[in-house]
Design a protein with these regions (language model features):
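A conserved hydrophobic secondary-structure block that centers on an alpha-helix together
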Residues: 11-22, 28, 95-229
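Soluble non-transmembrane domains of integral membrane proteins
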Residues: 516-600
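A generic, lipid-embedded transmembrane alpha helix
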Residues: 45-62, 220-227, 496
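Extended, hydrophobic alpha-helical segments in both membrane/secreted and soluble proteins
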Residues: 173-177, 184-194, 206-263, 277, ...
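Membrane-interfacial helix termini and the short, flexible loops that connect transmembrane helices
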Residues: 22-39, 66-70, 102-126, 193-210, ...
Length: 679
């Protein structure tokens, strides 16, 4: 039943996507409104197909239906219910099914949002693009990566279960879905960008329609990346959280281009400039999600996160990526004349100048990450050699970019549009500069050393104080409710980024570690802490056996463990972590006591300020959610204002708060907040 239901549902989804795209295309070419109306309704078939296929897969996993190859490979009778549910996205075919489910949800939301604009060419072409993308993924599942393939021969009675690493924390129930909500979410802005190019309507319309979709997707992707780092820290036993792994980079790349887009969009909204930048960034963001999907699902790059592909999915994804890039470039060339604008940046010391620099920096960051990720593939393709590009390359190349971005985070929000005077900058940056100098002095007096971390702390104080200043003045001028809006939310995002930067710098520069051989009852010293090994015990539960050590650290008990799953040969290290705002103590077993050697090997790490990474990530997500909150009536772009005869540019609230006449002029009316970009 599960196989029949699942495969029928996939066919229904593919049929709905093809019929919807065909109906809309014929309706556009013939001008028949009945076909345009009918074309909208096929989204129900796409969504129904994705939902029914998901129900069939979940039913198969929950009931241990080992007639499915997917269940046989990823389930066992010992697997707890929560991990049976999450097993749907623990392997290749199921992860593509999750992608199709999330995509159909976004397409349904797009249909609901724009249902009253059934005859708008931009909306119609956006839906056609969405249908084509959905058809590709449903077709992929029906051909090369069928999650409902039947087991040939005797039906097994037991499977190996999910990867043991995916059965250690319930974070696996949230981390991948959030990543997919983020990555797949950029499909909607991509569809509208393509539609605007096809129709030639490349002005402000597509940007206005997709702003909230972009921020929501960016928020989910940010939350997914942060949770992924937390999972790595809590589960893998290496005390790290970011290894520049190819799959980690695959999520980071679209995040970088999307962040650049959200900033750059403000310039087009305010000055009708950077059209090529904005549409290229959103096209690049979607293209990079497809490239990342190829990296993850092709097996060409080694990663603890990647899937094994033995059915041709990787080459198909690569061809799809190539087609997407070729079509995007072709559309940009075709509409190049219409995308060019007459406006020019009058001064580098202006908000648009700073945001253009921001684009260049994020672009450079993305290029470095992409180069380091694909370089081993290029070398292998050229001469057959196998090389790796590790953390030192990425750290060395990206650190200067991060420092420049921190500086821009402080300066850009206080800059006015068009040009700024030196006196204005001195006035608005006096307190942030003083705070930065104070933090640097305090760090030196506290005995902290190291050029890079001290520079990060200084610039973080500069940027953080600038964001706080903006928030304070905004609340004074507009009222407390202005926090829940685009300007307030954007500054809260900046505060979160500052916390992440501080946590990252401190945890990298000042971490201490040691590998201790500990006998029962004998104390050991580490960085001013006293550790005492109290012994081990074995705890057996359904399908797993855990050898748990007890180690006292300054009188507090820690319980690092090594877990062995009954149906897997892989032993999993389960670290013990005690977090405080100042420092984390992290313990991981490296060897267990035996009759011949009763001592235990314990890796111990003291990592300062790492908690602020997670706090900062939470603040970033909170700020992004606040920026989605309705913040007053929308303001028109410059072209719309001029068409009404006002000749006055609209307000953009991002960073336009402070003291002085020019800042006051930027503020919205009392009781209203502005409509600048959120991040």
């Amino acid at each position: 039943m599960n196989i029949a239901l699942g495969q029928s549902a996939l066919f229904l989804g593919l049929l709905g996507a093809l019929a919807g795209a065909g109906s809309l295309l014929v309706g556009l070419s013939s001008g028949r409104r009945s076909l345009l109306r009918a074309g909208q309704g096929y989204i129900w078939l796409v969504a129904l197909g994705a939902v029914l296929a998901t129900v069939a897969m979940q039913r198969a996993l929950i009931t241990h239906d080992f007639t499915l190859v997917y269940v046989d490979n990823n389930d066992s009778t010992f697997t707890p219910l929560i991990y049976r549910i999450t097993a749907m996205w623990s392997d290749l075919a199921g992860s593509i099914l999750l992608w199709a489910l999330v995509l159909s949800g976004y397409l349904m939301a797009m249909w609901i949002r724009f249902r009253k604009r059934a005859y708008d060419p931009v909306v119609v072409w956006a839906k056609v693009t969405g249908y084509v993308i959905a058809a590709f993924f449903f077709g992929l599942m029906l051909t090369l990566s069928d999650p409902f393939t039947r087991v040939h021969g005797a039906v097994p009675t037991q499977g190996p279960g999910p990867n043991p690493l995916l059965q250690d924390r319930v974070l696996v129930a949230f981390h991948p879905p959030l990543l997919y909500l983020g990555l797949v979410g950029f499909t909607v802005p991509f569809c509208f960008a393509v539609a605007s190019l096809v129709t030639g309507q490349v002005g402000q319309g597509w940007l206005f329609e997709t702003r909230r979709w972009s921020i929501f997707a960016w928020t989910c992707l940010t939350a997914g990346v942060v949770l992924g780092a937390w999972w790595s820290y809590q589960v893998l036993g290496w005390s790290g959280y970011w290894a520049w792994d190819p799959v980690e980079n695959s999520a980071l790349l679209p995040w970088l281009t999307a962040t650049a887009f959200l900033h750059s969009a403000m310039v087009q909204q305010r000055r009708a400039m950077l059209r090529v930048w904005n549409i290229s960034l959103i096209l690049s963001t979607f293209s990079l999600t497809i490239l990342g999907t190829f990296f993850t699902r092709s097996g060409v790059l080694e990663s603890v996160h990647s899937f094994t592909d033995d059915g041709g999915v990787g080459p198909t994804l690569l061809v799809f990526f190539g087609l997407v890039v070729a079509i995007c470039i072709g559309l940009l060339v075709w509409r190049g004349d219409q995308l060019r604008t007459q406006g020019a940046i009058e001064s580098p010391l202006s908000r648009e100048g700073a945001l253009l620099a921001n684009n260049l920096l994020f672009g450079a960051f993305a290029f470095v990450v992409l180069l380091g990720t694909v370089f081993p593939l290029l070398v292998q393709a050229l001469n057959g050699s196998s090389i790796t590009v590790g953390g030192p390359f990425f750290d060395t190349m990206t650190m200067p970019i991060v420092l420049c971005l921190l500086f821009l985070m402080a300066v850009a929000p206080v800059l006015p549009w068009r040009r700024a005077s030196g006196e204005l900058l001195r006035q608005r940056l006096a307190w942030p500069a003083a705070a930065a100098a104070g933090v640097l002095a305090a760090c030196v007096l506290a005995g902290l050393r190291g050029f890079w971390p001290l520079l990060v702390f200084t610039l973080a104080a500069f940027a953080g104080t600038s964001a706080l200043r903006q928030l304070v003045v905004l609340v004074r001028r507009v009222g407390p409710r202005s926090i829940a809006g685009r300007s307030g939310g954007g500054m809260i995002v900046h505060l979160g980024v500052v916390l992440v930067a501080v946590g990252f710098a401190a945890s990298h520069a000042y971490q201490h570690q040691a590998l201790l051989t500990m006998s029962v009852g004998k104390p050991a010293s580490f960085q001013g802490h006293t550790l005492v090994f109290r012994g081990t015990k074995t705890v057996t539960s359904s399908g797993r056996s855990s050898l748990i050590a007890t180690v006292d650290v300054d009188g507090h008990a820690y319980y690092p463990a090594i877990e062995q799953f009954a149906l897997s040969n892989q032993a999993v290290v389960s670290p013990a972590v005690h977090s405080t705002p100042a420092q984390d103590i992290y313990l991981a077993l490296t060897s267990v006591p035996t009759a011949a050697d009763p001592a235990a090997g314990v890796a111990v790490y003291a990592t300062p300020l790492v908690m602020w990474l997670w706090v900062g990530g939470l603040v970033v997500v909170l700020g992004a959610l606040l920026s989605l909150w309705p913040s007053g009536r929308p303001r028109a772009g410059p072209a719309e204002e001029r068409s009404r005869g006002h000749g006055v540019e609209p307000h953009d609230s991002y960073g336009s708060v402070g003291t002085g006449e020019q800042e006051t002029a930027d503020l919205p009316e009392p009781g209203k907040t502005g409509v600048g970009a959120a991040v």
